[in-house]
């Protein structure tokens, strides 16, 4: 029985803010691609109905952690529909590699991995569509991780169209700051009226991120990281930051630049993949 479950990072290869709804949420167009790099969840089934997170995250109460919330949500919904075997529970621990507030989707990916893994281990039989619907109640980015395929996203990020962008190599760098998403989305100078375009048009354009100008203005570390990366390759912010990335055609080119990274920059090289490592394990 599989007990080690990948929880991959994602990149937003582009991100455009197309408007703001009456409820305050922003509408966007973005392109998600996974990385063959991320956290690892270790999940051991229990038979007493208990959910235990064995590796607490600093600053986050266990019951508020997306890992625990996802497990309890699946338990509740599967139980209410008569699909939860008696006594289903789990011990969960995490090898954390992805930074908090980094724009790599770590928390959302963790939640999705828990939903997919426990549905499999408990043999609940929920469909991917059902799991994605549950995931959306936990966060806008959770469904793309549940579905496990690179996707063009619209709406508030919940309308997903599978796509297959080129699988390039990336140097991903964390500049040492954490950016809470609301800091970017509440900034009055954030561009909020980028015209909507078709996916075909967007894939032919030079990629960019509307959040980048705000992140660079408010966080000098992000500005410094991007300034350094841009000397070597096309580079931009992922999500609302703080991570930035540069794209390369080969692993060797990416690693050559990594070797020159300044000491204050925490960086790694990973390949972009259109099929999530989580789903690759399940095939």
Swiss-Prot record:
Pathway(s) annotated for this protein in UniProt: Isoprenoid biosynthesis; isopentenyl diphosphate biosynthesis via DXP pathway; isopentenyl diphosphate from 1-deoxy-D-xylulose 5-phosphate: step 3/6
Annotated catalysed reactions: 4-CDP-2-C-methyl-D-erythritol + ATP = 4-CDP-2-C-methyl-D-erythritol 2-phosphate + ADP + H(+)
Active-site feature positions: 10, 141
Keywords: ATP-binding, Isoprene biosynthesis, Kinase, Nucleotide-binding, Transferase
Enzyme Commission designation: 2.7.1.148
Coiled coil region boundaries: none
UniProt key word Hydrolase: no
GO molecular function term, any single one: ATP binding
Pfam families documented for this protein: GHMP_kinases_C, GHMP_kinases_N
Residue sites binding ATP per the record: 99-109
SUPFAM superfamilies: GHMP Kinase, C-terminal domain, Ribosomal protein S5 domain 2-like
BP GO terms, sorted: isopentenyl diphosphate biosynthetic process, methylerythritol 4-phosphate pathway; terpenoid biosynthetic process
Record-stated family: Belongs to the GHMP kinase family. IspE subfamily.
Record's subunit section: Homodimer.
Summary of the function given for this chain in its UniProt record: Catalyzes the phosphorylation of the position 2 hydroxy group of 4-diphosphocytidyl-2C-methyl-D-erythritol.
Name listed for the protein in its UniProt record: 4-diphosphocytidyl-2-C-methyl-D-erythritol kinase
Gene it is expressed from: ispE
